[in-house]
Amino acid sequence: MTTAERTAPPDALTVPASRAPGCPFDPAPDVTEAARTEPVTRATLWDGSSCWLVTRHQDVRAVLGDPRFSADAHRTGFPFLTAGGREIIGTNPTFLRMDDPEHARLRRMLTADFIVKKVEAMRPEVQRLADDLVDRMTTGRTSADLVTEFALPLPSLVICLLLGVPYEDHAFFQERSRVLLTLRSTPEEVRAAQDELLEYLARLARTKRERPDDAIISRLVARGELDDTQIATMGRLLLVAGHETTANMTALSTLVLLRNPDQLARLRAEPALVKGAVEELLRYLTIVHNGVPRIATEDVLIGGRTIAAGEGVLCMISSANRDAEVFPGGDDLDVARDARRHVAFGFGVHQCLGQPLARVELQIAIETLLRRLPDLRLAVPHEEIPFRGDMAIYGVHSLPIAW
């Protein structure tokens, strides 16, 4: 039996772990308890194999910042959270599941598109889109589903503009994204959705070769360094991550503010707090809730435990972002907190490339909703809100609101 195949102790917690009923904004209680009592512990994965669970802020940063922990999904023992996840990553890995130098080479092709200066220049256009969506949502109505009318369309429109993807195809790519991110999707369902999305993007790349524009896919084609499949794989990452994460953060942030009226009132009274409040919401909600996977390439001491070469690791950024040593009172939402040390976007060389764009989108989305909808409220009881515990990216499936 190899190191990677060792089973966890019988009492080891299972991942993905479930949140407690009635506590939709808190990490899974098993993960929280591990962070308190055994910060580096063994866990059981869906297929019965085991990995290490790293739960404290200091240790999570240590793993994610150490090149001895590989992001290469092709290494034996890499900890996949689901069978479908293994299908996605194992057959067409993005640069997020590669190590340097190949990771750095591919990432550099996109860096200029997501630097703060360029993203800030997009702020007026993102604001225009946000206001247009609110106009459409509120015209002749007093209620709507925030997810379908605002939270999902806004980042979808923005990422389509950046990539050069026709927005009229949004239903197609949003549905394939849903399948890819559903934890219960079978490998066959994932393979079909992935193949359809990759073929769509490869076909788009071929179109850009004939009719170029100034968007990302067209520029990747013009570089001549990648074939259509590689461009499609890179486009898939940007398209799925570029709309799903911000959409769910927008909806979940709105809900948690409505559930914390004192914090909502403070933001309304002090709009200048919105920029910092976005960092606090990213910390508090941590929608990448099932962990960031790595695999050790040599024996490494983390949190007093030796993680052996070939053993998988899940970095639980949800519990790291509640670490009381870094964020005192971290189980409470405080929109005035300095939350800049959060790891919601990861840490190290693989941290989220699109975080400057996500910040701008979230700042504009929250400020616009608070400004345009002074009587914003839930249209159904909180208990009826359907949470996305079944998805790799946490959030809500719908959010009925009224104004």
Swiss-Prot record:
Residues 1-24 are annotated as: Disordered. InterPro entries: Cyt_P450, Cyt_P450_B, Cyt_P450_CS, Cyt_P450_sf. Induction: By herbicides. It is an enzyme of class 1 (oxidoreductase). The keyword Ligase does not apply. Keywords: Heme, Iron, Metal-binding, Monooxygenase, Oxidoreductase. The keyword Metal-binding applies. Heme binds at residue 352. PROSITE patterns: CYTOCHROME_P450. It comes from the Bacteria. Its EC number is 1.14.-.-. One of its GO terms (molecular function) is oxidoreductase activity, acting on paired donors, with incorporation or reduction of molecular oxygen. Pfam families: p450. Its cofactor is heme. Belongs to the cytochrome P450 family. Metabolism of a number of sulfonylurea herbicides. This is Cytochrome P450-SU2. It comes from Streptomyces griseolus. The gene is cyp105B1.
